[in-house]
Amino acid sequence: MARFMAYNQNPQMLALCITVAVMFLGVRSELSQDIKGCQDAMSDLYSCLPFVTNKAKAPDSTCCSTLKVKIDKGQTRKCLCTLVKDRDDPGLGFKVDANRAMSLPSACHVPANISQCPDLLHLLPDSPASQIFKQFTESSSQTVGHKAVSTSSSIKGRDNKQFGLMMAGALSIWYIM
């Protein structure tokens, strides 16, 4: 009761709490939206997780046979792209190796064009997430083996959104006070 009265007597504190809550809900809902349509496809590709999380040297036969059957059906191709795009999101519950996830189709001898991922995910051509797919496509067309895709120095799209939300919250607080 005392806490409620404190918020009631201090509208700036109430505004701050609401702003922070909205910011965190907005950031969390992006992963939920991305993964929402992928539940079936991801459960189909569960056997591929050891490979894309760098726990197995090669995808197993179950992974590859499932990928061959499912890649052109439903959301599987888009979900594989989403897995790469959201690879660093703690909400996934596991760490995805972007190079391994993008090389999964070729490791299973399944035709899939990773360069189509930015279009499938409706990414802006110059966005950091789009650049991951572009770098991988360029490196795999220039060499027989796959080079590592550098992501540590780039600012990810999700980080940009979170930074924008934090700035909006800070400006709101500054304006109220």
UniProtKB/Swiss-Prot annotation:
Primary subcellular site in the record, as a coarse category: membrane
Q: Which UniProt keywords apply?
A: Cell membrane, Disulfide bond, Glycoprotein, GPI-anchor, Lipoprotein, Membrane, Signal
**So which tissues is this one expressed in?**
Expressed in seedlings, preferentially in hypocotyls and roots. Also observed in siliques.
Q: Which domain of life is it from?
A: Eukaryota
Protein's cellular compartments: Cell membrane
The UniProt similarity line reads: Belongs to the plant LTP family.
Its name, as the record gives it, is Non-specific lipid transfer protein GPI-anchored 22
Organism, by scientific name, is Arabidopsis thaliana (Mouse-ear cress)
Q: The organism's lineage?
A: Eukaryota, Viridiplantae, Streptophyta, Embryophyta, Tracheophyta
